[in-house]
Amino acid sequence: MGDQEILILVDENDNEIGTDTRENCHSGKGRRHRAYTAFIFHGGKMLLQQRSRKKLLWPGAWDVSFTSHVYPGETYQQAASRRALQELNARVGPLTDVYSFVYFAPQGENAENEFCRVLVGDFNGEFTPNADEMMSVKWAGIKEVEADLRVHPDSYTPWFKLSFEGFLKSPASKRYA
């Protein structure tokens, strides 16, 4: 799909207001579009990925288990299932929607400008990271991530920090503490 990937433009309440290309949605100040982040857990630890150096935005930064955009005609769950296969070569079960936020994060001449839902769930299967998407992965406990964020906040994507903060405030976080 490349730069012709079509994304859903939304307002601050996630109401659809149109579509545009991925390139236009991330160029300059960007255009607000629909996205999600997903945290998957196994044995009380969350899967984190380190973004590929090939990424346009925040290459090499630590990120959520997987993340992407919701395409026209897709639900958040369908988008998460699609992306788990692309990024992790894995199938994930239903994920729980725990939080949403709107953010703008510029980097150079590009930016993220998204309405983002945070999805959380358990994962007990095998996976194979897609090297085009990520450099490495690690499993980490919530307390370990909190401590690392305090010491190395710039090592994480802006949406990771917002997603993690919202997740910690949600009742779902108690299940994984």
Per-region residue spans from a language model:
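Acidic, metal-coordinating catalytic segment for phosphate/diphosphate chemistry
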Residues: 2-37
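Short, solvent-exposed loop/turn elements at beta->coil junctions and helix N-caps
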Residues: 23-27, 100-106
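Nudix hydrolase/Nudix homology domain
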Residues: 60, 99-103, 110-177
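A short coil-to-beta-strand element that immediately follows conserved catalytic motifs
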Residues: 91-100
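Conserved Nudix-box catalytic region and its N-terminal flanking loop in Nudix hydrolases
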Residues: 24-36, 41-82, 151
